[in-house]
C-alpha cells in the first residue's frame, strides 16, 4: 500500500517563504526582503509626498545571515515581502569536521549546519572544548539556516 520511496519527513505545509506587507506598515527591528535577501531593518525614513507621486520609504537592512547592508526605496503604498523566520534552540552535542551536531527537543540529532564564521564560531568551539553545555540558536528563513547565537543551558 505505502510506497517506500516517498519520504515526507522534511516537507512543509506549502507555506510561502515570505508574505506581503505594505511599506508604511514596516517597522525598525522588523524583517523585510531587500534585493532578494532576508534582512533586519536597522534604519527607516519616509519622505513627504512630492508634486507627482507617493510618499517614499527608505529602508536600510542588514542581511540576517551574512551581515551585509542593503538599501531600498519604495512608495509607502507598495507591498514588500517579509520573510517567514523561524528561530529554534538546539543543544550542542558535538563538533566534527566543521559541522555542528545539534540535538532537537525530541532527541533527534541534526548534523547539517556548519560552524559559523567569525567570533561566534570561535566562541562555540572554545566553550564546547571547555566542556560547557550550550544551546545554539538557529535562524531559518527562505530556505537558508544558520547558527546566530549561543547561550548557556539552564539546569
From Swiss-Prot:
- Name the gene for this chain: eif5a
Q: How does it sit in the membrane?
A: Peripheral membrane protein
Q: Describe the family membership recorded for this protein in Swiss-Prot or TrEMBL.
A: Belongs to the eIF-5A family.
Give the modified residues of type Hypusine. 51
Query: How is this protein organized at the quaternary level?
Result: Binds to 80S ribosomes. Actively translating ribosomes show mutually exclusive binding of eIF5a (eif5a or eif5a2) and eef2/eEF2. Interacts with dapl1/dap1b; interaction takes place at the polypeptide exit tunnel of hibernating ribosomes and prevents translation.
Q: Which organism is it from?
A: Danio rerio (Zebrafish)
GO molecular function of the protein, one example?
A: RNA binding
Q: What is the name attached to this protein's record?
A: Eukaryotic translation initiation factor 5A-1
* Compartment(s): Cytoplasm; Nucleus; Endoplasmic reticulum membrane
Q: What is any one of the record's Gene Ontology cellular component terms?
A: endoplasmic reticulum membrane
Amino acid at each position: 500500500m505505502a510506497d517506500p520511496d516517498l519520504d515526507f519527513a522534511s516537507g512543509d505545509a506549502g507555506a510561502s517563504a515570505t508574505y506581503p506587507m505594505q511599506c508604511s506598515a514596516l517597522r525598525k527591528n522588523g524583517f523585510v526582503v531587500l534585493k532578494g535577501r532576508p534582512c533586519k531593518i536597522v534604519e527607516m525614513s519616509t519622505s513627504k509626498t512630492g508634486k507627482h507621486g507617493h510618499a517614499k520609504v527608505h529602508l536600510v537592512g542588514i542581511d540576517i545571515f551574512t551581515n551585509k547592508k542593503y538599501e531600498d526605496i519604495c512608495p509607502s503604498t507598495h507591498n514588500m515581502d517579509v520573510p517567514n523566520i523561524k528561530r529554534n534552540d538546539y543543544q550542542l552535542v558535538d563538533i566534527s569536521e566543521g559541522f555542528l551536531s545539534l540535538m532537537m527537543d525530541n532527541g533527534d540529532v541534526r548534523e547539517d549546519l556548519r560552524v559559523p564564521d567569525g567570533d561566534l564560531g570561535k566562541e562555540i568551539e572554545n566553550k564546547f572544548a571547555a566542556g560547557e553545555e550550550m544551546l545554539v540558536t538557529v535562524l531559518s528563513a527562505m530556505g537558508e539556516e544558520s547558527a546566530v547565537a549561543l547561550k548557556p543551558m539552564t539546569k
